[in-house]
From Swiss-Prot:
Protein name per Swiss-Prot or TrEMBL: Probable K(+)/H(+) antiporter subunit D
Entry membrane topology: Multi-pass membrane protein
This protein's record includes keyword Transmembrane helix: yes
Alphabetical UniProt keywords: Antiport, Cell membrane, Hydrogen ion transport, Ion transport, Membrane, Potassium, Potassium transport, Transmembrane, Transmembrane helix, Transport
A Gene Ontology term for the protein's cellular component: plasma membrane
Main location (coarse class): membrane
Alphabetical list of PANTHER family matching this protein: NA(+)_H(+) ANTIPORTER SUBUNIT D1, NADH DEHYDROGENASE
Keyword match Transmembrane helix: yes
Gene: phaD
Subunit structure: May form a hetero-oligomeric complex that consists of six subunits: PhaAB, PhaC, PhaD, PhaE, PhaF and PhaG.
Length: 539
């Protein structure tokens, strides 16, 4: 491989991995230096992701090595391959962008709350990028474990009893999920003789019934492991508490962790169990629909019940996951592009909200958190309070924080004209993408239930955000004006600005999502591209 472009695919993994190793021996007193190196690494990864996304959007002919990187020059299915297509490029760009914002936010003060923050952060980025690029299930397990190992340390970063308790629960649940992952992978390999996803997609239909059943059993166990990560009910009891306990930059980047589970479910469902899977086509579809809808309902109830903003954000993650899982499970091809648009919009919004929460709560009265917990446990209090001052001027800091909070509320609720509304509209219009005469007969009860839950979840988010916003910004008891530095508010503004830009550029964005959906709905084309990719030097 003489052309440097051939190695672009591995750099989003190799660069943060190397930087993580370089940062470990640097003394913790030089945190500014470590932060600068880590931020520069994440910035370069983001630029690389943008380049790869642009190449992927132009088509496979413009991709280095046709989008397939063969480690050691061993072809698939025998060797390890990294595969870039529109979906993996999209996830790379989303991950690196969110990581860049979270790392910039941490530079204000949070990276000093513990040891080796930036090394762990780089390992997390490397694990995420590897999970999105790998073409086989075993290396998916490797990158999954790398990502989880880093997330364990990051969740405990900052110490404190709440973080330790939530972190131990998080570790226990994810260790169990990792064990299930390994069992599922072993069953699939024993039955099919391959772990390359493209190769598995071509072999599944030809397997004898007994072997195909073992593959389905292994995939079901594998699915449980990733549904734990995606936060599907009833496997999501750990998520709101863990995410609420994490430090703001960690919680911000954790917004994309649940999307790893969603990504793998999409890959397995549409590539391995797609239209070419024969008798196994659509395997597990009913479970995704049922679990996704129950997750939306559970998340919506949690959003309404939450008085603390951290828990509200955690339950919003569940609503997002349930919306995507049910959309994939319903099996309407027209919904897939809208689901991908929703994935991007909701991840950016929730990431921005997690970063914003600490800034908003920084100026609250010391008893406000106690009051919030008490109200969540025992209900609201009826107090008649007289306002001492009417028409007081709003300080500039609170005005900016309030505006960002309002944007988060509009995006989470899916109200026009922002990207949250466009995403939900695309989902519903994709569901109704059929002749009017067929709507009455073609629409199932599950379809109508999904539309209802989608609308009600937005209503729940709007009610909860209004309630918390009024208590925070219109409270009768005055709190101190929070001291916010530019490096803290800038990442929030940038992420929300990205959502606004996504709203303004909804047309081009939806065209990219539709092209991505078309690729996903052609599994044999993807498999052929991976398996027939030429070895370097043979072209």
């Amino acid at each position: 491989m003489t052309d440097w472009l051939d190695h672009l695919l591995i750099l989003p993994i190799l660069l943060p991995l190397a930087v993580a190793a370089v940062l470990i021996p640097i003394n913790e007193r030089d945190r500014t230096l470590k932060g600068a190196i880590g931020f520069a690494s994440t910035l370069v990864v983001f630029i690389l992701s943008m380049i790869l996304m642009r190449l992927a959007a132009a088509g496979t002919g413009s991709l280095p090595g046709s989008g397939v990187y063969q480690l050691g020059n061993w072809p698939a299915p025998f060797g390890i391959v990294l595969v870039l297509d529109r979906l993996s490029a999209l996830m790379l760009c989303l991950t690196s962008g969110l990581a860049l914002a979270a790392q910039a936010y941490s530079m204000a003060r949070w990276h000093t709350a513990g040891h080796h923050f930036h090394s762990l952060f780089q390992l997390l980025v490397a694990g995420l990028n590897g999970a999105f690029l790998t073409g086989d299930l075993f290396n998916l397990f490797v990158f999954f474990e790398m990502m989880l190992a880093a997330s364990y340390g990051l969740l405990l970063h900052g110490s404190g009893p709440l973080r330790v308790k939530a972190g131990l629960h998080y570790i226990a649940v994810n260790l169990a999920a990792s064990a299930l992952f390994l069992i599922g992978v072993s069953l699939i390999y024993g039955a099919a003789g391959t772990l390359n996803m493209a190769d598995l997609a071509t072999k599944l239909a030809a397997l004898e019934p007994r072997s195909r059943t073992l593959v389905e059993m292994g995939s079901a166990i594998l699915g449980v492991a990733f549904l734990v990560k995606a936060g599907m009910w009833p496997l999501s009891f750990w998520l709101p508490t863990a995410y609420a306990a994490a430090t703001p930059p960690v919680a911000g980047v954790f917004a994309v962790l649940t999307k790893v589970g969603i990504y793998v479910i999409i890959r397995l469902h549409l590539l391995v169990f797609g239209t070419a899977a024969g008798a196994s086509s659509g395997f597990g579809q009913e479970w995704l629909v049922t679990g996704g809808m129950l997750t939306i309902a559970f998340g919506g109830i949690g959003v309404l019940a939450s008085q603390a903003m951290g828990r509200l954000a955690g339950y919003s993650v569940l609503v997002s996951s349930g919306t995507l899982l049910a959309a994939v499970g319903l099996g309407h091809d027209g919904m897939l592009a809208g689901a991908l648009f929703y994935l991007v919009s909701s991840t950016l919004t929730i990431g921005a909200f997690f970063l914003l929460i600490e800034l908003v709560e920084r100026g609250r009265d010391a008893g406000a958190d106690v009051l919030a917990v008490t109200m969540e446990a025992y209900g609201d209090f009826d107090e008649d309070e007289e306002e001492e001052e009417v028409g007081a001027a709003i300080p500039g800091t609170m005005a900016v924080l309030g505006l960002c909070f309002c944007l988060c509320a509009l995006l989470l609720a899916g109200l026009p004209p922002l990207s949250g509304f466009i995403a939900k509209f695309a989902l519903i219009s994709g569901l109704f993408d059929m002749p009017a005469a067929e709507l009455a007969t073609a629409m199932s009860a599950a379809d109508w239930t999904y539309v209802t839950l989608l609308i009600l979840s937005g209503l729940a988010a709007m009610i909860a955000m209004n309630r918390i916003g009024i208590r925070t910004f219109w409270a009768s008891i005055e709190g101190t004006i929070p001291r916010v530095v530019v490096i803290e508010i800038t990442p929030v503004v940038v992420l929300l600005g990205a959502c606004i830009f996504l709203s303004l550029q909804a047309g081009p964005a939806m065209r990219y999502m539709q092209a991505t959906a078309d690729d996903l709905l052609a599994p044999l084309t993807h498999s052929e591209r991976v398996l027939s990719a030429p070895r370097a030097g043979s072209q």
